[in-house]
Amino acid sequence: MKLRRLPNGDLEVTTRKGNIYRAVDLHNGWFNIWDEQREEVVVMIQYMDEFFETIAYREFHLN
């Protein structure tokens, strides 16, 4: 995964397959990736500078 900080503080997440998702900043070191089709949070990311940890939420994996 490749992460890029957006001007509004959110993250742009690019997967190995080239899919792009937006991770919303929760302002506590965590970011949610929202799946619009499922209407639910599918992944939570903890981001600190260039280090990040991805925690799968439910059984959805980003492609």
Where are these regions (language model features)?
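Short intrinsically disordered terminal tails
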Residues: M1-K2, E59-N63
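Negatively charged, low-complexity tracts enriched in Asp/Glu with abundant Ser/Thr
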Residues: M1-T14
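Acidic, low-complexity, intrinsically disordered interaction modules
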Residues: T14-Y57
